[in-house]
Amino acid sequence: MNLNVVNRELKVGQIKMNGVSSSALFLIGDANLLILSSILDTPFETVTEGPFVPLVTDVPPTPG
């Protein structure tokens, strides 16, 4: 897929999310190249359902 988005003077004030999957990518900013991959080499019997890693909600602001 080729996607070209031009955002001039994009300023993000606040973001609210209801949920994020364990294989999600959330990006604000510029990126020339993104390569995402995933592999599951665990036997299916050992996979548990539910949240694997708690989401970090208290993220410090970036300086500047």
From Swiss-Prot:
**GO terms (BP aspect):** sporulation resulting in formation of a cellular spore
Keywords from UniProt, A to Z, are: Germination, Sporulation
Q: What induces it?
A: Expression is sigma K-dependent and negatively regulated by GerE.
Q: Which top-level group of life is the source organism from?
A: Bacteria
> InterPro entries, per this entry?
Spore_germination_GerPD_prd
What's the stated role of this polypeptide? Required for the formation of functionally normal spores. Could be involved in the establishment of normal spore coat structure and/or permeability, which allows the access of germinants to their receptor.
User: What name does UniProt use for this protein?
Assistant: Probable spore germination protein GerPD
Q: Which organism is it from?
A: Bacillus cereus
